[in-house]
From Swiss-Prot:
Bias type Low complexity, positions: 100-110, 276-286, 329-368
Assigned protein family: Belongs to the histone H2B family.
GO molecular-function terms, A-Z: DNA binding; protein heterodimerization activity
Region (Disordered): 99-123, 276-295, 328-394
Name of the featured protein: Histone H2B.v2
Length: 474
């Protein structure tokens, strides 16, 4: 079975000479790189089919790289691969021989031969010049080697072996990978994959701490999961592998109409024949729709929270007003009871003129006790009023406080004076409280303006007109 194990070991020795990599670490990293190669191929095939290309073109490969990798990594891989492809093309161009029409004489042929021999001698000079090492100009070695670690011959063998193992799992696999299986080993897609493998492997090994003696599977897995870009690539590799498995399960007849839509979120494809591939414009429209629906949900949540707060405020206001009403009613009841007691006491005094002094003393004591109890009730009521929160902005807190102080400082010697003073204080306090405060709870509820409480589209002009603002067309 072909693998990237030798390449991983070479790159690890070059980047981490002080560390060793375990077999489990090599196995995990090899599977990660193989899945990444498959993701690039799956998206390249999808791009080729969606644009109705007969084969995989460079624009399809670059589109796949932009989907699988973040923009910075994709741009780096594309630029390096383009430079390598141009360099290889120039070297191959130098080997092309020009054909003459026979019009040249033998002297011209001899001169051409001399120039060719001179150029070959200059190109084959591999000696060092002023301390610089000259790279041997051997096209047989370097034409297919993108880097020292991941030659494209190895990339091609591992990719084809990966496809074969994936097809063995399925009883009747489709021809999804047929377009890549028909390509030669020097196809440009392997150049791009080779650079992608080296860039990602280098990124993983560099992030491993230099103090690590043994690089195992857990360390590599943790590095990938902790890095946002690498973890994103890992998720896309897994999803692309699942998509390829579904496509291989499809029959060859229905696979021609099967569309695979891979985007930055890797949307899973449907096996229905009527499904169509989303274009970039349709994807943008879908994104805008999702964003609008998200904004509407957020607005509903905020609006409901606002309404809950307003309801709580109304409930607190209602409780305060109920306490005030209860306090005033208690005061009125106490006044009536005291008046009745005073009348009864006066009648008893008139009817019982001849009662002895002991009875008079008892009556006086009873009166004093009644006055004390009444004073206690008044003090309790004053404390209740003092603890209340302000209900209406029209009520003047300073006047209420003065009235409470008057209530506490009333002379307790005469019940009639107490009753008259209490009634006058209550009247003065009630004058400052509007009659609407004593109405039902529904009238007391202050709801926010409809402009900030709507749950469906409204006519803004109509709302402004209801508020007294009229707009005229100019």
């Amino acid at each position: 079975m072909e693998s990237y194990s030798p390449s991983i070991q070479k790159l690890c020795v070059f980047l981490k000479p002080e560390s060793d990599i375990s077999n489990t670490g090599i196995s995990y990293l090899n599977n990660f790189l193989a899945d990444m190669s498959n993701a690039i191929i799956v998206e390249s095939i999808h791009s080729s089919k969606s644009h109705k290309h007969k084969t995989i073109l460079i624009e399809d490969i670059e589109s796949a790289l932009n989907v699988v990798f973040p923009s910075e990594i994709a741009d780096s891989i594309i630029n390096q691969s383009k430079g390598r492809i141009q360099s290889t093309s120039l070297k191959n161009l130098m080997q092309v021989k020009t054909f003459n029409n026979g019009g040249n004489n033998n002297n011209n042929n001899e001169q051409d031969n001399d120039l060719q021999e001179k150029e070959q001698n200059e190109l084959s000079d591999d000696s060092d010049v002023e301390g610089f090492e000259i790279i041997p100009n051997n096209n047989n070695i370097y034409s297919h080697d993108v880097s020292l670690c991941f030659p494209i011959d190895l990339v091609c063998r591992v990719t084809l072996d990966y496809i074969c193992r994936k097809k063995v799992i399925h009883q009747n696999p489709s021809d999804f990978y047929k377009v890549i299986e028909q390509q030669q080993s020097n196809h440009v897609i392997y150049t791009y994959i080779s650079y992608a493998l080296e860039v990602i492997t280098t990124k993983i090994l560099i992030k491993i701490s230099s103090s690590t003696d043994l690089i195992d599977e857990d360390i590599i897995r943790k590095v990938i999961q902790d890095n946002h870009h690498l973890n994103s690539v890992r998720h896309k590799n897994i999803q692309a592998s699942n998509i390829a498995g579904k496509l291989l399960d499809s029959s060859s007849s229905s696979n021609s109409n099967l569309q695979t839509s891979l985007s930055s979120s890797f949307i899973f494809s449907s096996s229905s024949n009527n499904t169509t591939t989303f274009t970039q414009q349709e994807q943008q429209e879908q994104f805008n729709d999702d964003k609008i629906s998200g904004d509407e949900i957020e607005f509903e949540i905020n609006n409901s929270k606002y309404l809950e707060k307003e309801d709580k405020k109304d409930q607190l206001i209602q409780k305060d007003e109920e306490i005030i009403l209860k306090t005033f009613n208690d005061n009125n009841n106490n006044n009536n009871n005291n008046n009745n007691n005073n009348n009864n006491n006066n009648n008893n005094n008139n009817n019982n003129i001849n009662i002895n002094n002991d009875n008079d003393n008892n009556n006086n004591n009873n009166k004093n006790n009644d006055n004390k109890n009444y004073d206690n009730n008044n003090n309790n009521n004053a404390d209740k009023i003092e603890k209340l929160s302000p209900v209406n902005n029209n009520v003047k807190n300073s006047e209420i406080e003065k009235n409470i102080e008057k209530l506490k400082n009333i002379n307790n010697n005469n019940n009639v004076e107490i009753n008259e003073a209490l009634i006058s204080i209550i009247k003065e306090t009630c004058k400052n409280i509007p009659s609407s405060s004593f109405s039902s709870v529904k009238n007391l509820k202050r709801s926010p303006p409809s402009l900030f409480k709507f749950k469906e589209p409204i006519d803004l002009v109509q709302v402004l007109a209801e508020g007294g603002i009229h707009m005229e067309a100019t």
